[in-house]
């Protein structure tokens, strides 16, 4: 019995492709590594220039839980658990482990309404201004590489719109991109699979991720491109009687020795494996200019090449016996290259498509305005090494070798993104550093019925993974008249004029929960 599975291309594939044999035995796969194995633990550094960052979207069920309360503020037991967690405001750090300077920090949440692209004012999120005074008590000047961390996904880079100033002058920065900040898991109820993304759900997840400095140290490394040889089959020049068969499908079938060959795919909607014959079938709806589908279609073979393949057209994506049709054709071009080169070509095509047809990719298309193909490619290679078929233990989400989801999620998953710049603190003197960006809140979904539809949550970490020695920290709220504070462990009391408070650097975490004040209407 043929085991067919539906790739995660929701709404695109015929019912005949839905999972029919979940109990089929697991297939053994070889583990493919880069020749430069030492590079596997290193990260990518983006090119110089101003960067743009944002958070937003579903973050997974989590908490904006507080630590011990001070300043007569609420404690952890009073904090709200949010359905979508946006991550905390993180402190400035340096690439140097012992920078030799002290720091005073002041963090402000500005609740001025934000004007959206349509011109409407929205009381959603806050502008964060995170300021530092660095003091050099030594008898020599100290030059530091500053790393300002922001939680976000690459797809959101335009909306956060951060800036860093040094001594009042806007600094040129490099964007340094960290790994995916979350993990993988099942759907609950005893499901032990790793099919689903599990975003960080509370501040302690970021504490576990960043504590000890390994994440930051990895970020500052350099990644070597994947130079392993591959054979690429590119499919073009599509033809089919789509007027008669609107879901006309092209299938390519072959057999491989799975201990010697691994196949990655892009642009294919269907996959099947016949456990009796060992035949593997990849299929795609023939592009007709009407259906939303990718034009770029590739099979990337790592290891032993295919010994042959057959092409067959079908009425629809089910690819069932008896539903073969004539008139379905394509051109298949075979080429030999490296994994890096084919992924780089794919990244160029994806980013070009995002620019030409942003509606197809939605919010992901914003990445095309920020990310260059070379950086995108290195991030995709890194994801393949960590979670895909270049990993010792691929997660279920990516173990099919389908690159479509992996390439999209490289752009969308939450990470810690660093703005990198340099500063010299003169002997006996100071340097002032200010980072500013828009911060999305944690929230509950409007349709959840939780009763917290308009509640917004914000978190702040005082010293997490910072190399700086803090001597003082304070926090403030600006334009607090626009919001009502419903929960906190900070100590703000705007109604009585308390809009700035001292923080305890020894307390790792502070939280703030607000609701917009309803506006009077005419």
Cite the ranges covered by each PLM segment:
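Internal signal-anchor transmembrane helix that establishes type II topology
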Residues: 27-53
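Disordered, charged N-terminal biogenesis/targeting segments of membrane/secreted proteins
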Residues: 1-29
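Generic structural microfeature
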Residues: 1, 5, 39-40, 127, ...
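Lumenal/extracellular ectodomains and adaptor appendage modules
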Residues: 53-522
């Amino acid at each position: 019995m043929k085991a067919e599975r539906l790739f995660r291309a929701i709404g695109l594939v015929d019912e005949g492709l839905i999972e029919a044999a979940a109990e089929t035995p697991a297939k053994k796969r070889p583990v493919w590594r880069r020749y430069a194995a030492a590079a596997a633990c290193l990260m990518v550094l983006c090119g110089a220039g101003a960067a743009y960052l944002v958070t937003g979207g579903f973050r997974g069920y989590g908490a904006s839980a507080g630590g011990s309360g001070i300043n007569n503020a609420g404690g952890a037991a009073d904090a709200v658990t949010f359905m979508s967690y946006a991550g905390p405001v993180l402190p400035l750090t340096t690439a140097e482990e012992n920078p030799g300077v002290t720091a005073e920090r002041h963090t402000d949440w500005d609740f001025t309404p934000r004007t959206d692209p349509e011109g409407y004012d929205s009381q959603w999120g806050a502008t964060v201004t995170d300021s530092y005074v660095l003091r050099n008590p030594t008898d020599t000047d100290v030059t530091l590489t500053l790393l300002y961390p922001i939680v976000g996904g690459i797809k959101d880079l335009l909306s956060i719109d951060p800036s860093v100033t040094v001594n009042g002058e806007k600094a040129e920065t490099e964007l340094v991109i960290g790994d995916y900040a979350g993990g993988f898991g099942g759907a609950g109820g005893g499901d032990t699979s790793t099919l689903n993304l599990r975003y960080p759900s509370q501040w302690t997840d970021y504490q576990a991720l960043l504590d000890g400095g390994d994440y930051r140290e990895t970020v500052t490394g350099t990644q070597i491109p994947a130079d392993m040889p591959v054979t690429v089959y590119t499919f073009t020049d599509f033809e089919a009687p789509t007027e008669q068969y609107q879901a006309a499908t092209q299938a390519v079938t072959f057999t491989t020795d799975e201990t010697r060959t691994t196949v990655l795919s892009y642009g294919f909607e269907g996959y099947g494996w016949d456990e009796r014959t060992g035949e593997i079938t990849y299929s795609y709806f023939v592009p007709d200019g009407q259906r939303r589908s990718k034009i770029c279609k590739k099979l990337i073979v790592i290891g032993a090449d295919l010994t042959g393949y057959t092409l067959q057209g079908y009425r629809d994506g089910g690819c069932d016996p008896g539903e073969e049709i004539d008139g379905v054709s394509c051109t298949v071009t075979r080429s030999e290259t490296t994994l890096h080169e084919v992924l780089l070509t794919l990244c160029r095509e994806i980013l070009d498509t995002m620019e030409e047809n942003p509606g197809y990719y939605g919010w992901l298309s914003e990445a095309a305005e920020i990310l260059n193909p070379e950086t995108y490619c290195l991030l995709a290679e890194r994801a393949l090494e960590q979670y895909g078929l270049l990993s010792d233990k691929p997660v279920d989400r990516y173990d099919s070798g389908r690159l479509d989801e992996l390439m999209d999620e490289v752009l969308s998953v939450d990470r810690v993104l660093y703005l990198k710049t340099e500063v010299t603190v003169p002997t006996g003197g100071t340097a002032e550093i200010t980072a500013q960006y828009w911060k999305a809140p944690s929230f509950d979904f409007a349709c959840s019925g939780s009763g917290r539809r308009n509640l917004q949550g914000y978190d702040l970490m005082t010293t997490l993974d910072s190399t700086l020695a803090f001597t003082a920290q304070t926090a403030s709220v600006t334009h607090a008249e626009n919001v009502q504070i419903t929960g906190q462990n900070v100590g703000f009391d705007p109604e009585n004029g308390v809009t700035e408070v001292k923080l305890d650097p020894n307390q790792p975490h502070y939280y703030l929960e607000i609701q917009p004040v309803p506006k009077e209407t005419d």
